[in-house]
Design a protein with these regions (language model features):
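RNase H-like, Mg2+-dependent phosphodiesterase core
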Residues: 1-188
Length: 189
């Protein structure tokens, strides 16, 4: 109900990266403290050149205009484009409109948590409950959650009456009540 974040990850083949990421799990299964700790591991792996990742947001205005899935697709596309700019020589082939939504596993360049996305310009494969099945998706879920939570804590300081520090903008009863009480229906922050 407040904010959106998507994360994209490129994992380089590295036994060290895999070993050091052994505690990474679905972000929903980790405490906030554990997520922060694992995000620090991801940042270290990136600094050492073992993985590369990008975080991108879908804005409140984009959610209102396109719905949450449309804004998420847009943020995913932005993250992929950021990765392409960061990594020399790395790119994803775009899918023509007539192509199927996803390619054979050997050709897949992007995996997403959930079902394959309609109207997404990159070859991809959906993995249901992927954050519990794929290290890359689990890493992505941690980075997305940590980044989003940090943004919500920033907004909590700016708008304390909404209780973002407690519910992080998710649709809890307390969040809905604060929205109704304080009449905040839309902001572009």
């Amino acid at each position: 109900m407040a904010g959106a974040c998507v994360f994209s990850l490129k994992l380089f083949e590295s036994p060290d990266a895999l070993l050091r990421s052994a505690l990474i799990n679905d972000s929903k299964q980790l405490s906030a403290e554990s997520r922060e700790s694992q995000f620090t591991v991801l940042e270290s792996l990136q600094a050492e050149g073992l993985i590369d990742f990008a975080v991108a947001f879908g804005s409140v205005a984009e959610i209102c205009e396109r719905n949450i899935l449309g804004a998420t697709r847009l943020a995913m596309q932005r993250a992929i484009e950021q990765l392409a700019q960061q990594a020399d020589g790395w790119s994803l082939p775009q899918v023509a409109a007539a192509d199927p939504l996803f390619k054979a596993a050997s050709e897949v360049k992007v995996i997403v948590d959930g079902r394959p996305l309609k109207s997404f310009p990159y070859a991809h494969e959906g993995v249901i409950k992927g954050d519990g099945k794929s290290l890359s998706i689990a890493m992505a879920s941690i980075a997305a959650k940590v980044t989003r939570d940090r943004e919500m804590l920033r907004l909590a300081e700016k708008y304390p009456v909404y209780g973002f520090a407690q519910h992080m903008g998710y649709g809890t009863a307390a969040h809905r009540a604060a929205l109704i009480k304080h009449c905040l229906l839309y902001t572009s922050d």
